[in-house]
Each structure stands twice: as C-alpha cells, then as structure tokens.
Amino acid sequence: MGAQFSKTAAKGEAAAERPGEAAVASSPSKANGQENGHVKVNGDASPAAAESGAKEELQANGSAPAADKEEPAAAGSGAASPSAAEKGEPAAAAAPEAGASPVEKEAPAEGEAAEPGSPTAAEGEAASAASSTSSPKAEDGATPSPSNETPKKKKKRFSFKKSFKLSGFSFKKNKKEAGEGGEAEAPAAEGGKDEAAGGAAAAAAEAGAASGEQAAAPGEEAAAGEEGAAGGDPQEAKPQEAAVAPEKPPASDETKAAEEPSKVEEKKAEEAGASAAACEAPSAAGPGAPPEQEAAPAEEPAAAAASSACAAPSQEAQPECSPEAPPAEAAE
C-alpha cells in the first residue's frame, strides 16, 4: 500500500486527494478490520474512523503527500501494531524464563506501551502464565516419578544387596567365629580335663605311694624286729635242745601245723594286696603314672605283712624244735 501511494504521489499535487478518497472508498469494503496492512484489535473498520484518519493525515502535511504517507507508516510502525503486541507479550512472558535477548525485551516493551489493555495481550499473558504454570507442573510431575523410582531402587538396594551382603558377612563371620571358638574351646577343655585327670591321678599315685611307703616302713621295722627276735631265739633255744631232742617226731608235726596257718595268712595277705592294687588301679589312669609303679609299693607292704605273719609262727615253733627252725624259715 505504501509503495502504491508513493508511485501515485510522484504524478503531482492532484494525487494528494487520492489517498484520502482511496481510504474512504476502501474502508467500507474491508470487513475484516484491516487498514494499511495492519490488524485492528478492536475490529473497528467504520468509514467514520477511516475518514478521521484520512483527515488527520491530510492536515499533517497536505502539501507533501509522499511525506504524509511515510509519516503515518512510521507512526504505525513506531506505535507497534496489535499483532506485534500480541507476539511481543508472549515473548515477554517467555523472556524471563529463557533469558531473552535485549531486542526481544525492547519489542515487548513497546507492544505493552502501545496496547496494554488489549484482550489478545491478556489472552497471551494468560496463555504464557498457563504455560509457565503448566511447565512447573510438568516438571513436578516428571520429578516425582524419578524420585519415586529412585527410592524404590534405593529400597531394593538396601533391602536386597546391602542388607543381604551384611547379613551374609555377619552369618559367615558368626559361623567362622563360632566354629573357631568352639574348636579352640574344645581343645582347651580337653586339655584342662586331661590336666585335671592327670593331676588327680598323679596326686592319687603320690598319695598311694606315700601310704605304701609309710605302710612299708612299719612293716620293715616289724620285720627287722622279728628277725632280731628270731636271731635271739636260737640262743635261748640252745639250752632247750637237750630236752626237746627226744621229741623230734611230734615237733615235726607241730612245724607242719604251723606252716599251714602261715600259708593261709600268706594267701590272705596276697588277697589284700590284690584288693589294694584294684583300688589304686583307677588312679593309675592318668598319664605318667603306670600301674606297675603303684602296684609295686602296694605289693611291698603285703609282702612285708606276709613275712611278718610267717615269722610269728616260726618263732612259736622254734622253742619247740630249735634244730628245725632254720629250715622252716628257709622254706618260707
């Protein structure tokens, strides 16, 4: 439109009236609300408005139609058309979010200054606000889903992986420690039992040996005393030999009778020694205490007691028959 008017303006002053007439004639026919190539926000395309616009243009500079057309064009461009305002305001809403360039910020500023209360601007702002509000909602909706997913994954990790590993390690450690501890305690207990048993056996063996020695000592003393008495008997028996000589046959019978009780006493002594050895046998179970060593001291007092028991009847028999007393002792 501006180019067409500039071409007509070059023909002469008569062209000055044509733009107004053309505007008046063309304005009623434009039902879509377009004028000078721009969209009107209010949709007012009445001929009165067109005439007023044409008169203002003619009054501004009637002698220079070309300048008149250029100035309205400049004014229209500077006033920022409604379409530019519509486009600028959504850009303004998007600018703070995306950090728009200064050029975009200037354009929306002009658009807002030109038509701040236009419905389209309000609609654009509402749309931008809705988009801005919806975008956080979308972000919120997107963020909860990963947040919900991540805790599930974490729960799975905690419940299955970490706890299972920890429980596995703990069970393994417990089993190993329990096994090692049990094994260590078992040998310790066994060693303690062995030591206790060995100590008890050794103590019993020592006690038995001591008792055997004590019993053997008096037995030996008694035997020594009996031997001394037996040694002194022959001296006393010498004067009696003459009186006893004719009685040799009955004396021999008496010696036999004396030997029989001595044998019985020997058997009793052997049985007593066997019983003592049997009593001390359990104590010999401990290590380092062989039964032979304990049985030997037990047999010694038994032998001493047997010898003393045998010596007594021999002494009794010696006064009766002194010549046969030494062979009786030798036989014993």
Swiss-Prot record:
One of its GO terms (biological process) is neural tube development. Phosphorylation by PKC displaces MARCKS from the membrane. It also inhibits the F-actin cross-linking activity. PKC-mediated phosphorylation increases 4 to 5-fold upon TNF-alpha or LPS induction. Myristoylated. A proper myristoylation is essential for the proper distribution to the plasma membrane. It is found in: Cell membrane; Cytoplasm, Cytoskeleton; Cytoplasm. Residues 26-35 have a biased composition (Polar residues). Its main location: membrane. A lipid is attached at G2 (N-myristoyl glycine). GO terms for cellular component: actin cytoskeleton; actin filament bundle; cell cortex; cell junction; centrosome; cilium; cytoplasm; cytosol. Detected in spermatozoa. Residues 152-176 are annotated as: Calmodulin-binding (PSD). Pfam families: MARCKS. GO terms for molecular function: actin filament binding; calmodulin binding; identical protein binding; protein kinase C binding. The modification Phosphothreonine is found at T143, T150. The modification N6-acetyllysine is found at K172. Induction: By TNF-alpha and LPS in monocytes. The modification Phosphoserine is found at residues 26-27, 29, 46, 63, 77, 81, 101, 118, 128, 135, 145, 147, 159, 163, 167, 170, 262, 314. InterPro entries: MARCKS. Residues 73-102, 110-136, 197-227, 272-332 have a biased composition (Low complexity). Residues 250-271 have a biased composition (Basic and acidic residues). Keywords: Acetylation, Actin-binding, Calmodulin-binding, Cell membrane, Cytoplasm, Cytoskeleton, Lipoprotein, Membrane, Myristate, Phosphoprotein. Residues 1-332 are annotated as: Disordered. Residues 152-164 have a biased composition (Basic residues). Belongs to the MARCKS family. Membrane-associated protein that plays a role in the structural modulation of the actin cytoskeleton, chemotaxis, motility, cell adhesion, phagocytosis, and exocytosis through lipid sequestering and/or protein docking to membranes. Thus, exerts an influence on a plethora of physiological processes, such as embryonic development, tissue regeneration, neuronal plasticity, and inflammation. Sequesters phosphatidylinositol 4,5-bisphosphate (PIP2) at lipid rafts in the plasma membrane of quiescent cells, an action reversed by protein kinase C, ultimately inhibiting exocytosis. Interacts with CDC42. Interacts with GTP-bound form of RAB10. Interacts with calmodulin/CALM1. This is Myristoylated alanine-rich C-kinase substrate. It comes from Homo sapiens (Human).
